[in-house]
């Protein structure tokens, strides 16, 4: 077997066969380097894919939504135990609505007032207790309050006027006192001047 392989190899690479081979195409150095890089990258990717273990991650599930699904499933199983039939979520909601409507009290409203007369009387008593004052009394109390406010306003106005007058009088008194002091000073000076002139008149003849 090995002999046959070597024989075929020698036959393939004989000088006559090598002459029959086509001439190699001229390839640029950059193209050769790019092909080598691509080959290395492909080998690295294949090696990584073979060495890495692929793990399937389950999709994200909202915990609240999951809890709601569990509750719905429990309700469905409970209804199945009661009726002996498997129901969908929509059928379960319709059955629960019908049960709720049946359990709620039913009120019949007529054209007349539904509230009994005793309730009207009780509410009237409560209103009479809470509102002890009649409208006339309320108006009178309002007028009285306004009068009090007016009186207080008048008193404050009178007090202000008194204070203003007293301050004005005190200012006048101060001005009068100043004038009196000035006039006294002038009188004394005039009297002294007269005396000196009289003495001069008397002394001149001597």
Curated annotation (Swiss-Prot):
Taxonomic superkingdom: Eukaryota
Similarity-based family: Belongs to the FAM228 family.
Protein name: Protein FAM228A
UniProt source species: Homo sapiens
